[in-house]
């Protein structure tokens, strides 16, 4: 099955502590998990590594979030949208279901 949410897509969070926030997909880990820029921030306790001259401390980083908790953001309507697939010139492309506009 083709991925409905891909890298560099702008998405909006539907549920959880970051509900309503928007961000860009940085990395797709699997079919069900992605990392979104500035969303689902967690604090990681990091030990110092003297060999690499790396200080220790508490570091904030993005954790993975389930794709089911996200929706693609349609800039034309300013809302979350659903994704469909169709063939254009022999190629499978994604489109927004609300206005049938092709996703770039």
From Swiss-Prot:
Gene Ontology annotations for the cellular component aspect, listed alphabetically: ribonucleoprotein complex; ribosome
GO function terms (MF aspect): rRNA binding; structural constituent of ribosome
GO terms under biological process: translation
Keywords per UniProt: Ribonucleoprotein, Ribosomal protein, RNA-binding, rRNA-binding
CDD domains recorded: KOW_RPL26 (cd06089)
NCBIfam families (alphabetical): rplX_bact
Job description of the protein: One of two assembly initiator proteins, it binds directly to the 5'-end of the 23S rRNA, where it nucleates assembly of the 50S subunit.
Family: Belongs to the universal ribosomal protein uL24 family.
Quaternary organization: Part of the 50S ribosomal subunit.
Protein name per its UniProtKB record: Large ribosomal subunit protein uL24
Species lineage: Bacteria, Pseudomonadati, Pseudomonadota, Gammaproteobacteria, Enterobacterales
The gene coding this protein: rplX
